[in-house]
Amino acid sequence: MTVAVFLAILCLRAALAAPRPDYSLDAEWEEWKRNNAKTYSPEEEKQRRAVWEENVKMIKWHTMQNGLWMNNFTIEMNEFGDMTGEEMRMMTDSSALTLRNGKHIQKRNVKIPKTLDWRDTGCVAPVRSQGGCGACWAFSVAASIESQLFKKTGKLIPLSVQNLIDCTVTYGNNDCSGGKPYTAFQYVKNNGGLEAEATYPYEAKLRHCRYRPERSVVKIARFFVVPRNEEALMQALVTYGPIAVAIDGSHASFKRYRGGIYHEPKCRRDTLDHGLLLVGYGYEGHESENRKYWLLKNSHGEQWGERGYMKLPRDQNNYCGIASYAMYPLL
């Protein structure tokens, strides 16, 4: 038994010692279970109900702070409502994501628009869900290659995340327990291709590598690490398209994010555990109000956040590590 699983069990056992259920929440609990297709054994229901009620309290507290203008983003009860903090951390990348300061192809006289959303060009595929598998790293890599493939061919083809999970173990990745986008890009480059989701579908678990060269739909010639600053990140995003990034996504507020610009006081720029796709930037309100944000695509399904996307503070000292681990491929 792994330490992470052992801790998760301890958290659930601790929930058993919680007070009896708040019966005033019965209807809300039953509705939440229906909406999220949750079924439990009688004993597990007691445990999950206790965890869920604690999360309800946390969300109410956050909402009250919003009313006092202490926050400017919202959170909500979603499919993760019955999960402990440790269980949610197991869904993120357990690998320590670090990179040396990189270089990228810098073009001169690049015009930087005030706002940018690569979704408007059609080069961003629909949001997908990683489920209970900690493969965010693979989703961000596949998504960045999808965008480059569209820019080159005009075809938006969802690529196989499962191909990356199964076939990068020999590169040091840990399948559903985390992996490094850098080594995933290395695999695609060295392997000479990557399959589509249609021929190598997602299973949310590790299986043996079943890649077949004749089914490959894309190759990458090389990939680049963006220097660790937001100015370089913006220039790369404008010039080359959506970028695979990583942030600190370890907080309960992240898993239950609903909308707005995500300000988490405990978010760190040197603790990176969740991969996303950077697709744009903008600002809320008037430009002079300095409410600037980065726009990111997550892999928790469309029910999470703003239809699967989130906004992260921009030009605020590399908030949550947005510029600490950024890469893009070229075909």
Curated annotation (Swiss-Prot):
InterPro entries: Papain-like_cys_pep_sf, Pept_cys_AS, Pept_his_AS, Peptidase_C1A, Peptidase_C1A_C, Peptidase_C1A_papain-like, Prot_inhib_I29
Signal peptide: 1-17
Protein origin, superkingdom: Eukaryota
Record keywords, A-Z: Cell cycle, Cell division, Cytoplasm, Disulfide bond, Endosome, Glycoprotein, Golgi apparatus, Hydrolase, Lysosome, Mitosis, Nucleus, Protease, Secreted, Signal, Thiol protease, Zymogen
Keyword Aminoacyl-tRNA synthetase: no
UniProt-listed PROSITE patterns: THIOL_PROTEASE_CYS, THIOL_PROTEASE_HIS
Gene3D superfamilies reported for this sequence: Cysteine proteinases
Protein name: Cathepsin 7
Source organism per UniProt: Rattus norvegicus
Originating gene: Cts7
